């Protein structure tokens, strides 16, 4: 069922919408999916989108909300007019779920749209609690999101429309966003994946490029042909299912 929770963190009341599978607690811990809304959004939208998978996949689905009214995830320090420790907030929730014997510590995942997808790249770089992440319809910030010596290799699946403004990358005085191809290259190299991807189709309009390392680490680009920042609903549903398949096949050791 669904629950709404407000958590005090960093002097702010932070809103979570949590959907748990009917079998919660009967079979020990469960995989957890965090989902992050786009700029100006609320937790309700991603909750409606992802919560149906709670029972289907035995997942705890957590739709987190950025501090209102700005409602933008802190994907890079110094970018927004006001800043909040969103990374620390998410890590606190993960810690509580694991210590409460609800979350499987080897199966914590994240996805997000637009601003939420950018935030996923920050989590991929700065944290080591996620088994895999799937940023969607977003860019990746040059410098801020490049993995470094402190980053743990992690599987990533990027879903993006080839007509999305972020697909080809962008640059302005405040921020440079990598193209989809360039960010795949950055994470492919870091995860020690082969240079040549396996290319498969999910119907005519979804093209999947999978880069794999000898140890089985993946970096994947799911390109939605002819689609912009918001995928057509049937394609979005198909991409979401593909993303969940990808996420759940990975475990953090």
Language model features by range: what are they?
Residues 1-32, 56, 78, 82, ...:
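A domain-start/cap signature at the N-terminus of enzymes
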Residues 24-71, 142-143, 166-168, 230:
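Short substrate-entry loop that stabilizes the transition state in hydrolases
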Residues 65-85:
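Cap/lid segment of the alpha/beta-hydrolase catalytic domain
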Residues 151-156, 215-219:
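Short, proline-enriched alpha-helix->beta-strand connector loops that line the catalytic pocket
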Residues 165-179, 232:
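Conserved alpha/beta-hydrolase "acid-adjacent" motif
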Residues 228-235:
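Catalytic histidine-centered segment of alpha/beta-hydrolase-like enzymes
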């Amino acid at each position: 069922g669904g629950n709404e929770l407000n958590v005090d963190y960093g002097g702010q009341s932070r809103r979570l919408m949590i959907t748990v599978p009917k079998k919660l607690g009967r079979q020990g811990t469960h995989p957890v999916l965090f989902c992050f809304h786009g700029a100006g959004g609320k937790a309700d939208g991603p909750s409606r989108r992802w919560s149906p998978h709670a029972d289907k996949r035995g997942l705890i689905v957590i739709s987190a909300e950025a501090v209102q009214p700005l409602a933008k995830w802190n994907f890079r320090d110094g970018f927004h007019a006001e800043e909040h420790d969103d990374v620390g907030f998410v890590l606190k929730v993960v810690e509580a779920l694991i210590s409460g014997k609800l979350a499987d510590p080897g199966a914590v995942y994240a996805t997000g749209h637009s601003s939420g997808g950018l935030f996923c790249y920050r989590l991929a770089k700065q944290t080591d609690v996620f088994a895999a992440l799937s940023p969607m319809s977003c860019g990746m910030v040059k410098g801020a999101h490049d993995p470094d010596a402190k980053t743990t290799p992690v599987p990533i699946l990027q879903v993006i429309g080839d007509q999305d403004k972020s697909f080809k990358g962008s640059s302005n005085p405040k921020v440079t966003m990598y193209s989809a191809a360039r960010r795949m290259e950055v994470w492919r190299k870091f995860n020690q994946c082969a240079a040549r991807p396996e290319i498969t189709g999910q119907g005519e309009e979804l093209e999947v490029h999978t880069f794999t390392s000898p140890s089985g680490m993946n970096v994947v680009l799911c390109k939605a042909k002819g689609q912009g920042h918001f995928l057509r609903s049937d394609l979005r549903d198909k991409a979401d299912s593909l993303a969940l398949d990808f996420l759940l096949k990975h475990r953090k050791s």
